[in-house]
Amino acid sequence: MKIGVHKIAMAAPNDVSGLKCLIDRGAVDPATIIALIGKTEGNGGANDFTRGFATPSFQLLLAPLLGLTPEEVGSCIAFVWSGGTEGVLSPHATIFTRSPSEVARTPRLALGIGITRDFAPEEIGRMAMVEAVAAAVHDCMNQTGITDPQAVHYVQVKGPLLTPARVADARARGAALATEDPNGSKAFARGAMALGVALGLGEVGATDLSDQVIARRLDLYSSVASTSAGGELKNCEVLLFGNSPAYGGDYCIGHATLSDVIDADGVRGALASAGLAVNSSVSPADANRIAVVFAKAEASPTGAIRGRRNTMLSDADINYERHARAALGAVIASITLDPAIFVSGGTEHQCAPGAAPIAAIVRASAV
């Protein structure tokens, strides 16, 4: 098997013309599409409806081509959106395909997909979510033929947060919630999903985990998890990326840790991990080898970066996640020469506090 990677620009959350063009010219067979990961131009908060707008737009395009209903398309293709394209970040989507291929001489990009059950409001940000994500991670590894967790470089999880309607439902039933603040629930949801990845990959032990540590014991974390929460989902979608000896194709993935949002060396480290050594910015030729970059952005909990105070955490007008996404997006784009980057905010249990994961998929050099 091999994984194909196709990045398209989006002029609006409902712009599917890029994918339609790829299909029309035969570059993508819709029957091979297994996942789509993208950035929309909303605010990234609990009231960001651009994500829920984008998914049905792509489902409506693909449904007649696959002979399915739009709802059935959503059952066989994973759609993961992150809202917020602040600064230079450009709205886009990356389409992933899977098709038959001979095995390569060295491990190549593999992608496993797991879907959890739906969660009740009182389970969001709790151990039920942690355990379900961990089970999905195990399933994804089995799908890809990856047996060594060190070969896993990026695990994208998108799941539900607590909307006002879900909070009201829980109150009516007398169910206790992790929090009753919809925007505040993002930290608990993201944290639970990240700890699920950490548990599934053996980065933390089951005895270390409980409801009480989620979004609190930040010394417990995964180095490869990237989690997002939105009101448009009831379950968690888990996409596990690694390099598998059972796969062929043209791509490899690598990862690194960003010490802060201006860590250019961390960006270069992720590219090098994927097989592309870069001293400063990439050359135009090497830029064409970079298929996609995924990163998380976080404001330092100290309120300072490299000894200099900033106002990310104290700005009453702009959420700190939006500040962080804008800053990191500019740093990455200055190196890769492409502002169509998947940068998501909030890193609860995703690397150590203040740090953040970054992964890059690169076209492999000839071997």
Walk through the language-model features, giving the residues of each.
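Terminal domain-initiation and capping elements
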Residues: 1-367
